[in-house]
Amino acid sequence: MGDERGDGRAGRFGGRIALVTGAGSGIGAAVARRLADQGAQVFAADVDGAAAATVAGELPGSHALTMDVADPAGVDRAFTAASAAHGRLDVVVHAAGVDDPAAKEWLAEALLDDRPPEVTTRLGDDAWRRVLRVNLDGTFHVLRAALRVMVPRRSGAVVTVGSSSAFDTLAGYPHYAASKAGAHALSQAVAKEAIAFGVRVNTVAPGPTQTGMAQRTPAALRRGLAGPRVRPYAAPEEIADIALFLASDDAANLVGAVLLANGGRFTV
């Protein structure tokens, strides 16, 4: 596009309105910054409203939204407010998600003790539902809200952030793997429906990435995910760049794609 940014330079997303979930930190924050740097006006949404406000405060013309993706009414309110401000949303990147620090500790303990992990028998319903509620239900809430805004205009691009764990999970991390595999399948199913209305939906599936979630991962487990034959943990900006590609006109022929970005740990 030939749109001009505020600094006079053309931006790939110049003149576009974007909403990013999980924008208070990690991949979401990197996506919000990249979009703003390339000309978009960004709504930075996060369950941590203060973190969202901090990121939005760095970005010209951007706004913060407090939004819990597990709360469908809250998601609808946020999307309504964002779309009402400009009459549309052109790009949505859904990067919000959670892990399970307790399960990671159990995995690390098993690794240090040189024994097989036993997590499923210890996993409570509350822990299972928390991960599925945010990672899978939250993806549905965001996709539904995005399509409600984009379908009437017959235009838009949605990118969901999945995980390489959907393909090859750690032994002993079943709820996270299930949530991300479900989110991938959901995104692909919605993509096949939405393209008839001019809306593209795609997914980026990162491997280990240097985020707050990774920092909470026990050191023993982090070492197990590293190695000389693979790339180091990705920077959030590397994953953000893939998300921006999927959201851009350069990816116009990609619909329902799941791009694996795991540094060579495995292929599919």
What are these regions (language model features)?
Residues 2-9, 168, 255-268:
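Short C-terminal tail/terminal secondary-structure segment
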Residues 155, 235-261, 266-267:
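C-terminal substrate-recognition "lid" of short-chain dehydrogenase/reductases
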Residues 163:
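Residue(s) in the substrate-gating loop at a strand-loop-helix junction
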Residues 143, 179, 187:
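Active-site helix of classical SDR
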Residues 103-129, 214, 224:
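Substrate-binding pocket helix/loop in short-chain dehydrogenase/reductase
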Residues 148, 192-193, 252:
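Alpha-helical segment proximal to the catalytic Tyr-Lys
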Residues 195, 200, 254-256:
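Short, small/polar-rich loop/turn modules that mediate ligand/substrate recognition or access, typified
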